[in-house]
Regions:
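Conserved, mostly hydrophobic/aromatic
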Residues: 40, 61, 72, 83, ...
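A charged N-terminal "starter" segment
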Residues: 1-129, 143-144, 395, 403-406, ...
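Active-site-adjacent beta->alpha loops and helix N-cap segments on the catalytic face
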Residues: 133-146
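Alpha-helical scaffolding segments of alpha/beta enzyme cores, especially the outer helices
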Residues: 42, 46-49, 67, 71-74, ...
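A cross-domain feature marking catalytic cores of carbohydrate-active enzymes
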Residues: 58-62, 81, 104, 129-131, ...
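Structural preference for beta-strand elements that scaffold enzyme active sites
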Residues: 55-57, 78, 97-101, 124-126, ...
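Active-site loop/helix belt of alpha/beta enzymes
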Residues: 2-5, 143, 153-292
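Charged (often Lys/Glu-rich) extended helix/loop segments that serve as interaction or gating elements
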Residues: 269-415
Protein backbone atom coordinates (compact mmCIF):
# COMPACT_ATOMS: atom_id res chain seq x y z
CA UNK A 1 0.00 0.00 0.00
CA UNK A 2 1.21 3.50 -0.83
CA UNK A 3 2.13 6.00 1.81
CA UNK A 4 -0.08 9.05 1.65
CA UNK A 5 -0.05 12.44 3.33
CA UNK A 6 2.44 11.26 5.98
CA UNK A 7 5.08 10.13 3.46
CA UNK A 8 8.50 11.84 3.60
CA UNK A 9 8.07 15.37 2.18
CA UNK A 10 11.35 15.22 0.29
CA UNK A 11 13.37 12.47 -1.36
CA UNK A 12 17.11 13.03 -1.56
CA UNK A 13 19.47 11.09 -3.81
CA UNK A 14 20.81 9.20 -0.80
CA UNK A 15 17.30 7.80 -0.24
CA UNK A 16 17.29 5.82 -3.50
CA UNK A 17 18.39 2.16 -3.43
CA UNK A 18 21.88 2.35 -4.92
CA UNK A 19 22.20 -1.38 -5.60
CA UNK A 20 18.97 -1.32 -7.57
CA UNK A 21 20.08 1.74 -9.52
CA UNK A 22 23.31 0.00 -10.45
CA UNK A 23 21.40 -3.06 -11.64
CA UNK A 24 19.07 -0.90 -13.74
CA UNK A 25 22.01 0.86 -15.40
CA UNK A 26 23.68 -2.47 -16.15
CA UNK A 27 20.50 -3.87 -17.67
CA UNK A 28 19.16 -0.89 -19.60
CA UNK A 29 22.26 1.20 -20.30
CA UNK A 30 22.90 4.89 -19.76
CA UNK A 31 21.90 7.63 -19.82
CA UNK A 32 18.70 6.33 -18.25
CA UNK A 33 15.68 7.99 -16.69
CA UNK A 34 14.40 6.09 -13.63
CA UNK A 35 10.86 6.94 -12.50
CA UNK A 36 9.33 5.82 -9.20
CA UNK A 37 5.55 5.66 -9.60
CA UNK A 38 4.92 5.02 -5.91
CA UNK A 39 6.60 8.36 -5.17
CA UNK A 40 4.36 10.07 -7.74
CA UNK A 41 1.31 8.79 -5.87
CA UNK A 42 2.76 9.81 -2.49
CA UNK A 43 3.47 13.36 -3.64
CA UNK A 44 0.03 13.86 -5.18
CA UNK A 45 -1.76 12.51 -2.12
CA UNK A 46 0.30 14.67 0.24
CA UNK A 47 -0.52 17.76 -1.79
CA UNK A 48 -4.22 16.91 -2.07
CA UNK A 49 -4.43 16.26 1.68
CA UNK A 50 -3.34 19.86 2.30
CA UNK A 51 -6.31 21.10 0.24
CA UNK A 52 -9.18 18.75 1.15
CA UNK A 53 -11.92 21.01 -0.20
CA UNK A 54 -10.11 22.08 -3.37
CA UNK A 55 -10.06 20.70 -6.89
CA UNK A 56 -6.49 19.46 -7.38
CA UNK A 57 -5.44 18.85 -10.99
CA UNK A 58 -2.06 17.66 -12.24
CA UNK A 59 -0.27 20.05 -14.62
CA UNK A 60 0.67 17.64 -17.39
CA UNK A 61 3.39 19.90 -18.80
CA UNK A 62 5.75 18.83 -16.02
CA UNK A 63 5.82 15.21 -17.24
CA UNK A 64 3.43 13.92 -19.89
CA UNK A 65 4.61 10.32 -19.79
CA UNK A 66 1.74 7.88 -20.04
CA UNK A 67 2.90 5.99 -16.95
CA UNK A 68 2.69 9.21 -14.91
CA UNK A 69 -0.73 10.18 -16.27
CA UNK A 70 -2.19 6.70 -15.74
CA UNK A 71 -0.81 6.59 -12.21
CA UNK A 72 -2.33 9.94 -11.28
CA UNK A 73 -5.67 9.16 -12.90
CA UNK A 74 -5.77 5.97 -10.84
CA UNK A 75 -5.70 7.99 -7.60
CA UNK A 76 -8.38 10.44 -8.71
CA UNK A 77 -6.40 13.32 -10.16
CA UNK A 78 -7.80 15.39 -13.00
CA UNK A 79 -5.46 16.74 -15.66
CA UNK A 80 -4.68 20.31 -16.75
CA UNK A 81 -3.24 20.60 -20.25
CA UNK A 82 -1.50 23.41 -22.10
CA UNK A 83 -1.49 22.08 -25.67
CA UNK A 84 -3.51 19.75 -27.90
CA UNK A 85 -0.81 17.12 -27.63
CA UNK A 86 -1.24 17.10 -23.86
CA UNK A 87 -5.01 16.84 -24.25
CA UNK A 88 -4.56 13.86 -26.56
CA UNK A 89 -2.07 12.19 -24.23
CA UNK A 90 -4.40 12.63 -21.27
CA UNK A 91 -7.28 11.07 -23.21
CA UNK A 92 -5.07 8.22 -24.40
CA UNK A 93 -4.11 7.57 -20.77
CA UNK A 94 -7.78 7.23 -19.84
CA UNK A 95 -8.87 10.72 -18.81
CA UNK A 96 -12.51 11.64 -19.31
CA UNK A 97 -12.51 14.64 -21.69
CA UNK A 98 -15.31 16.19 -19.63
CA UNK A 99 -12.88 16.55 -16.71
CA UNK A 100 -10.01 18.17 -18.63
CA UNK A 101 -8.92 21.78 -18.47
CA UNK A 102 -7.08 23.31 -21.42
CA UNK A 103 -5.06 26.45 -20.72
CA UNK A 104 -4.46 28.25 -24.01
CA UNK A 105 -1.33 30.43 -24.22
CA UNK A 106 -1.04 32.15 -27.62
CA UNK A 107 -2.58 28.96 -29.02
CA UNK A 108 -1.81 27.85 -32.58
CA UNK A 109 -4.86 27.48 -34.82
CA UNK A 110 -4.57 23.70 -34.77
CA UNK A 111 -4.75 23.69 -30.96
CA UNK A 112 -7.88 25.84 -30.88
CA UNK A 113 -9.48 23.72 -33.61
CA UNK A 114 -8.79 20.60 -31.56
CA UNK A 115 -10.08 22.10 -28.30
CA UNK A 116 -13.23 23.56 -29.88
CA UNK A 117 -14.04 20.24 -31.56
CA UNK A 118 -13.41 18.38 -28.30
CA UNK A 119 -15.65 20.80 -26.42
CA UNK A 120 -18.45 20.32 -28.94
CA UNK A 121 -18.62 16.65 -27.97
CA UNK A 122 -17.73 17.04 -24.28
CA UNK A 123 -19.49 19.92 -22.58
CA UNK A 124 -17.48 19.48 -19.38
CA UNK A 125 -14.22 20.57 -21.01
CA UNK A 126 -13.02 23.94 -19.73
CA UNK A 127 -10.91 26.21 -21.94
CA UNK A 128 -8.86 28.90 -20.18
CA UNK A 129 -7.59 31.87 -22.18
CA UNK A 130 -5.46 34.86 -21.26
CA UNK A 131 -6.19 37.19 -24.18
CA UNK A 132 -9.40 38.75 -25.47
CA UNK A 133 -8.21 37.80 -28.92
CA UNK A 134 -8.20 34.12 -27.99
CA UNK A 135 -11.85 34.31 -26.92
CA UNK A 136 -12.66 35.94 -30.28
CA UNK A 137 -10.91 33.08 -32.06
CA UNK A 138 -12.89 30.54 -30.05
CA UNK A 139 -16.14 32.29 -30.95
CA UNK A 140 -15.12 32.26 -34.61
CA UNK A 141 -14.97 28.46 -34.32
CA UNK A 142 -18.50 28.27 -32.96
CA UNK A 143 -17.42 27.46 -29.42
CA UNK A 144 -19.68 28.82 -26.68
CA UNK A 145 -18.97 26.39 -23.84
CA UNK A 146 -17.14 26.50 -20.52
CA UNK A 147 -14.32 29.03 -20.25
CA UNK A 148 -12.11 30.59 -17.61
CA UNK A 149 -10.18 33.84 -17.80
CA UNK A 150 -6.47 33.76 -17.05
CA UNK A 151 -5.53 36.93 -15.20
CA UNK A 152 -2.20 38.60 -14.64
CA UNK A 153 -2.14 40.08 -11.13
CA UNK A 154 1.10 41.96 -11.81
CA UNK A 155 3.12 39.94 -9.31
CA UNK A 156 5.53 37.15 -10.21
CA UNK A 157 7.51 34.68 -8.12
CA UNK A 158 9.80 31.78 -8.95
CA UNK A 159 13.26 30.30 -9.01
CA UNK A 160 14.35 31.99 -12.27
CA UNK A 161 13.27 35.03 -14.28
CA UNK A 162 12.33 32.74 -17.18
CA UNK A 163 9.61 31.04 -15.14
CA UNK A 164 8.26 33.99 -13.12
CA UNK A 165 5.11 35.45 -14.66
CA UNK A 166 4.91 39.06 -13.54
CA UNK A 167 3.22 42.14 -14.91
CA UNK A 168 5.12 42.30 -18.19
CA UNK A 169 4.84 38.57 -18.94
CA UNK A 170 2.95 37.10 -21.88
CA UNK A 171 0.45 35.35 -19.60
CA UNK A 172 -3.01 36.58 -18.71
CA UNK A 173 -5.35 39.54 -18.94
CA UNK A 174 -3.90 42.59 -17.10
CA UNK A 175 -5.66 43.09 -13.78
CA UNK A 176 -7.15 46.45 -14.72
CA UNK A 177 -8.90 44.91 -17.77
CA UNK A 178 -10.32 41.79 -16.14
CA UNK A 179 -13.84 42.96 -15.25
CA UNK A 180 -14.44 44.46 -18.71
CA UNK A 181 -13.21 41.30 -20.40
CA UNK A 182 -15.31 39.18 -18.05
CA UNK A 183 -18.49 41.05 -18.99
CA UNK A 184 -17.79 40.46 -22.67
CA UNK A 185 -16.83 36.81 -22.19
CA UNK A 186 -19.90 36.07 -20.05
CA UNK A 187 -22.14 37.30 -22.88
CA UNK A 188 -20.64 34.84 -25.35
CA UNK A 189 -19.57 31.81 -23.30
CA UNK A 190 -20.27 29.99 -20.06
CA UNK A 191 -17.81 31.80 -17.80
CA UNK A 192 -17.04 29.40 -14.95
CA UNK A 193 -13.75 30.52 -13.45
CA UNK A 194 -10.75 32.75 -13.03
CA UNK A 195 -7.24 31.39 -13.40
CA UNK A 196 -3.77 32.62 -12.51
CA UNK A 197 -0.27 31.19 -12.35
CA UNK A 198 2.38 33.53 -11.02
CA UNK A 199 5.61 31.58 -10.91
CA UNK A 200 7.41 28.32 -10.33
CA UNK A 201 9.64 26.67 -7.77
CA UNK A 202 8.01 28.43 -4.82
CA UNK A 203 9.45 27.32 -1.46
CA UNK A 204 8.62 28.29 2.13
CA UNK A 205 10.57 31.58 1.98
CA UNK A 206 8.62 32.59 -1.14
CA UNK A 207 5.18 32.09 0.40
CA UNK A 208 4.67 35.71 1.42
CA UNK A 209 5.02 36.95 -2.16
CA UNK A 210 3.03 34.02 -3.51
CA UNK A 211 0.18 34.65 -1.10
CA UNK A 212 0.12 38.35 -1.98
CA UNK A 213 -0.45 37.32 -5.58
CA UNK A 214 -3.24 34.95 -4.50
CA UNK A 215 -4.89 37.75 -2.48
CA UNK A 216 -4.78 39.93 -5.59
CA UNK A 217 -6.34 37.24 -7.78
CA UNK A 218 -9.02 36.48 -5.19
CA UNK A 219 -9.89 40.16 -5.12
CA UNK A 220 -10.25 40.12 -8.88
CA UNK A 221 -12.53 37.08 -8.60
CA UNK A 222 -14.81 39.01 -6.25
CA UNK A 223 -14.84 41.95 -8.67
CA UNK A 224 -15.81 39.62 -11.50
CA UNK A 225 -18.57 37.99 -9.46
CA UNK A 226 -20.05 41.42 -8.71
CA UNK A 227 -20.01 42.13 -12.45
CA UNK A 228 -21.27 38.87 -13.96
CA UNK A 229 -22.45 36.59 -11.14
CA UNK A 230 -21.07 33.59 -9.32
CA UNK A 231 -18.00 31.71 -10.53
CA UNK A 232 -17.57 27.97 -10.19
CA UNK A 233 -13.86 28.07 -9.34
CA UNK A 234 -10.79 30.20 -8.68
CA UNK A 235 -7.74 28.39 -10.07
CA UNK A 236 -4.47 29.66 -8.58
CA UNK A 237 -2.33 27.38 -10.75
CA UNK A 238 0.72 25.57 -9.45
CA UNK A 239 4.23 26.81 -8.80
CA UNK A 240 4.78 24.88 -5.58
CA UNK A 241 8.41 23.81 -5.49
CA UNK A 242 10.63 21.06 -4.19
CA UNK A 243 14.10 21.50 -2.65
CA UNK A 244 16.76 20.90 -5.29
CA UNK A 245 19.67 21.76 -2.99
CA UNK A 246 20.52 19.43 -0.14
CA UNK A 247 20.28 22.19 2.48
CA UNK A 248 16.88 23.48 1.34
CA UNK A 249 13.91 22.41 3.48
CA UNK A 250 10.78 21.02 1.85
CA UNK A 251 7.46 22.82 1.84
CA UNK A 252 5.40 22.29 4.98
CA UNK A 253 2.23 21.42 3.12
CA UNK A 254 -0.11 21.79 6.09
CA UNK A 255 1.18 25.35 6.54
CA UNK A 256 1.01 25.98 2.80
CA UNK A 257 -2.61 24.87 2.72
CA UNK A 258 -3.53 27.16 5.60
CA UNK A 259 -1.67 30.15 4.13
CA UNK A 260 -3.15 29.72 0.67
CA UNK A 261 -6.72 29.35 1.95
CA UNK A 262 -6.26 32.42 4.15
CA UNK A 263 -4.95 34.40 1.19
CA UNK A 264 -7.90 33.38 -0.96
CA UNK A 265 -10.31 34.43 1.79
CA UNK A 266 -14.04 33.81 1.71
CA UNK A 267 -15.09 32.74 -1.76
CA UNK A 268 -18.24 31.24 -3.16
CA UNK A 269 -16.08 29.67 -5.85
CA UNK A 270 -14.17 26.45 -5.22
CA UNK A 271 -10.40 26.77 -4.94
CA UNK A 272 -8.51 24.90 -7.68
CA UNK A 273 -4.79 24.15 -7.95
CA UNK A 274 -2.48 22.63 -10.57
CA UNK A 275 0.65 21.09 -9.02
CA UNK A 276 3.14 19.71 -11.52
CA UNK A 277 6.72 19.95 -10.32
CA UNK A 278 5.70 19.12 -6.75
CA UNK A 279 4.18 15.83 -7.88
CA UNK A 280 6.93 14.47 -10.11
CA UNK A 281 10.28 16.23 -9.55
CA UNK A 282 11.80 14.01 -6.88
CA UNK A 283 10.14 10.88 -8.28
CA UNK A 284 12.71 10.59 -11.07
CA UNK A 285 16.46 10.68 -11.56
CA UNK A 286 18.93 10.23 -14.40
CA UNK A 287 21.69 7.62 -14.35
CA UNK A 288 24.79 8.53 -16.34
CA UNK A 289 28.16 6.83 -16.78
CA UNK A 290 31.54 8.55 -16.37
CA UNK A 291 33.62 8.22 -19.54
CA UNK A 292 36.38 10.81 -19.12
CA UNK A 293 38.42 12.28 -16.25
CA UNK A 294 40.54 15.30 -17.10
CA UNK A 295 42.72 17.47 -14.89
CA UNK A 296 42.30 21.01 -16.16
CA UNK A 297 44.36 23.92 -14.76
CA UNK A 298 41.59 25.08 -12.44
CA UNK A 299 39.34 22.04 -12.04
CA UNK A 300 38.84 18.32 -12.39
CA UNK A 301 36.51 17.79 -15.34
CA UNK A 302 34.32 14.69 -15.31
CA UNK A 303 32.81 13.72 -18.65
CA UNK A 304 29.57 11.71 -18.68
CA UNK A 305 27.28 10.26 -21.34
CA UNK A 306 24.29 12.43 -20.39
CA UNK A 307 24.12 15.94 -21.85
CA UNK A 308 21.96 19.00 -22.15
CA UNK A 309 20.01 16.94 -24.69
CA UNK A 310 19.18 14.61 -21.79
CA UNK A 311 18.52 17.31 -19.17
CA UNK A 312 18.25 20.89 -20.41
CA UNK A 313 17.39 22.71 -17.18
CA UNK A 314 20.97 23.45 -16.02
CA UNK A 315 21.79 25.05 -19.38
CA UNK A 316 18.44 26.78 -19.82
CA UNK A 317 17.75 28.02 -16.28
CA UNK A 318 21.15 27.64 -14.58
CA UNK A 319 19.23 25.12 -12.49
CA UNK A 320 20.89 23.22 -9.67
CA UNK A 321 20.39 19.44 -9.70
CA UNK A 322 21.95 17.23 -7.02
CA UNK A 323 24.56 14.73 -8.26
CA UNK A 324 25.74 11.64 -6.39
CA UNK A 325 28.31 8.94 -7.09
CA UNK A 326 26.20 5.78 -6.99
CA UNK A 327 29.16 3.45 -7.50
CA UNK A 328 31.21 4.73 -4.57
CA UNK A 329 29.30 7.25 -2.43
CA UNK A 330 31.77 6.73 0.44
CA UNK A 331 34.88 7.94 -1.38
CA UNK A 332 36.43 11.20 -0.28
CA UNK A 333 34.70 14.15 -1.92
CA UNK A 334 36.54 16.56 -4.16
CA UNK A 335 35.33 19.52 -6.23
CA UNK A 336 34.62 18.52 -9.82
CA UNK A 337 32.88 19.91 -12.87
CA UNK A 338 30.55 17.46 -14.62
CA UNK A 339 29.73 17.91 -18.30
CA UNK A 340 28.37 16.03 -21.26
CA UNK A 341 29.46 15.34 -24.86
CA UNK A 342 27.82 18.33 -26.58
CA UNK A 343 30.03 20.88 -28.33
CA UNK A 344 28.93 23.86 -26.26
CA UNK A 345 30.20 25.25 -22.99
CA UNK A 346 26.59 25.24 -21.76
CA UNK A 347 26.65 21.45 -21.53
CA UNK A 348 27.67 21.38 -17.87
CA UNK A 349 25.68 19.92 -14.98
CA UNK A 350 27.80 21.43 -12.21
CA UNK A 351 31.00 23.40 -11.63
CA UNK A 352 33.39 22.83 -8.71
CA UNK A 353 30.80 20.70 -6.89
CA UNK A 354 32.05 18.40 -4.09
CA UNK A 355 31.25 14.83 -5.18
CA UNK A 356 32.66 11.50 -4.01
CA UNK A 357 35.73 11.28 -6.27
CA UNK A 358 34.52 9.92 -9.64
CA UNK A 359 36.51 7.41 -11.66
CA UNK A 360 35.98 6.23 -15.21
CA UNK A 361 32.94 3.88 -15.52
CA UNK A 362 31.47 5.10 -12.25
CA UNK A 363 27.71 5.56 -12.23
CA UNK A 364 26.41 9.01 -11.26
CA UNK A 365 22.83 9.93 -10.43
CA UNK A 366 21.34 13.34 -11.24
CA UNK A 367 18.37 14.00 -8.99
CA UNK A 368 15.03 15.80 -9.24
CA UNK A 369 14.74 15.04 -12.95
CA UNK A 370 11.03 14.24 -12.98
CA UNK A 371 9.78 17.75 -13.74
CA UNK A 372 10.71 19.24 -17.13
CA UNK A 373 13.38 16.59 -17.58
CA UNK A 374 12.28 14.25 -20.33
CA UNK A 375 9.80 16.94 -21.42
CA UNK A 376 12.71 19.13 -22.56
CA UNK A 377 14.95 16.34 -23.84
CA UNK A 378 16.05 16.69 -27.46
CA UNK A 379 18.04 15.07 -30.23
CA UNK A 380 20.72 17.79 -30.28
CA UNK A 381 23.86 16.48 -32.02
CA UNK A 382 21.55 13.78 -33.44
CA UNK A 383 21.69 11.97 -30.12
CA UNK A 384 18.90 9.43 -29.61
CA UNK A 385 16.83 10.21 -26.54
CA UNK A 386 17.37 7.88 -23.57
CA UNK A 387 15.16 5.12 -22.26
CA UNK A 388 12.85 5.66 -19.31
CA UNK A 389 12.28 2.87 -16.81
CA UNK A 390 9.51 2.95 -14.22
CA UNK A 391 9.68 1.14 -10.91
CA UNK A 392 6.70 0.51 -8.65
CA UNK A 393 7.48 -1.54 -5.59
CA UNK A 394 9.23 -4.63 -6.92
CA UNK A 395 8.03 -4.16 -10.50
CA UNK A 396 10.24 -2.66 -13.22
CA UNK A 397 9.11 -1.77 -16.73
CA UNK A 398 10.48 0.15 -19.70
CA UNK A 399 7.89 2.88 -20.27
CA UNK A 400 9.88 4.64 -23.01
CA UNK A 401 12.32 2.69 -25.11
CA UNK A 402 15.75 4.06 -25.95
CA UNK A 403 15.74 5.74 -29.34
CA UNK A 404 17.97 4.52 -32.14
CA UNK A 405 19.77 6.42 -34.88
CA UNK A 406 16.93 5.38 -37.19
CA UNK A 407 14.52 7.21 -34.87
CA UNK A 408 16.60 10.36 -35.23
CA UNK A 409 16.21 10.45 -39.02
CA UNK A 410 12.95 8.59 -39.63
CA UNK A 411 10.93 11.71 -40.45
CA UNK A 412 13.33 13.01 -43.09
CA UNK A 413 12.74 12.70 -46.83
CA UNK A 414 14.90 13.20 -49.89
CA UNK A 415 14.78 16.63 -51.50
Amino acid sequence: MDASADSPPVRRLADWEHDRLGALADRYGTPLYVLDLARVRENYRRFAAAFPDAHVMYAAKAHTGRAVLETLLSVGADIECAARGELQRAIDAGADPDTLQYTAVNPPAADLDYAADLGADHSGLTITAGARDTFDRLADRGYDGRVAIRVNPGIGTGHHEKVATGKDAKFGIPAEQVTDVAADVADRFELVGLHSHVGSGVLQDDLDDHCRAIERVAGLARDVEREVGDLEFLDIGGGFGVPYREDEPPLEMEVVGERVRAAAGELGAQLALEPGRYVVADAELILTRVNTIKQAPSATVVGVDASLATLLRPAMFEAYHPIRNVTAPGRKSEPVSVGGPCCTSADVFCTDRPIARPEREDLLAIGNAGAYGYELASQFHSQPRPAEVAVDGGKTSVVRRRETLDDVTHGEQEF
